[in-house]
From Swiss-Prot:
Protein name: Nickel import ATP-binding protein NikE
Catalytic reaction list: Ni(2+)(out) + ATP + H2O = Ni(2+)(in) + ADP + phosphate + H(+)
Keyword Nuclease on entry: no
Alphabetized PROSITE patterns for the sequence: ABC_TRANSPORTER_1, ABC_TRANSPORTER_2, NIKE
Domain of life: Bacteria
Gene: nikE
Function: Part of the ABC transporter complex NikABCDE involved in nickel import. Responsible for energy coupling to the transport system.
Subcellular location: Cell inner membrane
Binding site for ATP: 45-52
Molecular function GO terms recorded: ABC-type nickel transporter activity; ATP binding; ATP hydrolysis activity; nickel cation binding
Lipid bilayer topology: Peripheral membrane protein
């Protein structure tokens, strides 16, 4: 089943010029893609290529300058109030900047309960039980429930944001560099959790990343973005080889898993 369909998406930002006139900076140019239920897809690209802007458009935080975004066959622009509430529940996003994504005055308990209070019909006791369950799933415990964001490490806060997104059992989870910043042990645990959710609920995942290792370990398909355009789409297999210049640059930037001894012909 197709969850998300994007066709001919373009976007720009206006900014003031030296002459006082507004100028438009193109960020996305004619982007089209589809995401299906249970699918794991990566959007790979260097910083500043338009990945995060695309993510903001997908979840409805901004409206595109041109093009169409449809969720389960319905254009986002035409969703009624009930459909929009269901959409906010079904598609969740975890941002790279976890500090800006939460209210620093709220406790972790309040942060986790917030989407459940607005998007689910659960009693308070059920919300608290699910909050504890989600914390455990991201390798945290109830000891953080009464803490506030400034009292947590960056990795802990990132996992709280992930737990918050998972609490409403979304159909699509968008992770904007949200897993790349975790250490490898935590990253592996989160990936196991996401795989379990896919099997249980058919949750689709869109990884917005520049981390090629993450793509190779978890994703079924990868799209390469460069200068606001998707320049290549590949199925992830045993050996991932890119044909675009942007894809090859990212692939060549990955360090080998083990040090490679440099051969020399010089005699000592």
């Amino acid at each position: 089943m197709t969850l998300l369909n994007i066709s001919g998406l373009s976007h720009h930002y206006a900014h003031g010029g030296f002459n006082g006139k507004h100028q438009h900076q193109a960020v996305l140019n004619n982007v089209s893609l589809t995401l299906k239920s249970g699918e794991t897809v990566a959007l790979l690209g260097r910083s500043g290529c338009g990945k995060s802007t695309l993510a903001r458009l997908l979840v409805g935080l901004e409206s595109p300058a041109q093009g169409n975004i449809s969720w389960r066959g319905e254009p986002l622009a035409k969703l009624n109030r009930a459909q929009r509430k269901a959409f906010r529940r079904d598609i969740q996003m975890v941002f790279q900047d976890s500090i800006s994504a939460v209210n620093p005055r709220k406790t972790v308990r309040e942060i986790l309960r917030e989407p459940m209070r607005h998007l689910l019909s659960l009693k308070k006791s059920e919300q608290l039980a699910r909050a504890s369950e989600m914390l455990k799933a991201v390798d945290l415990d109830d000891s953080v429930l009464d803490k506030r964001p400034p009292q947590l490490s960056g990795g802990q806060l990132q996992r709280v944001c992930l737990a918050r997104a998972l609490a409403v059992e979304p159909k699509l989870l968008i992770l904007d560099e949200a897993v790349s910043n975790l250490d490898l042990v935590l990253q592996a645990g989160v990936i196991r959790l996401l795989k379990k959710l896919q099997q249980q609920f058919g949750t689709a995942c869109l990884f917005i990343t520049h981390d090629l290792r993450l793509v190779e370990r978890f994703c079924q398909r990868v799209m390469v973005m460069d200068n606001g355009q998707i320049v290549e789409t590949q199925v992830v297999g045993e050996k991932l080889t890119f044909s675009s210049d942007a894809g090859r640059v990212l692939q060549n930037a990955v360090l080998p898993a083990f040090p490679v001894r440099r051969r020399t012909t010089e005699k000592v």
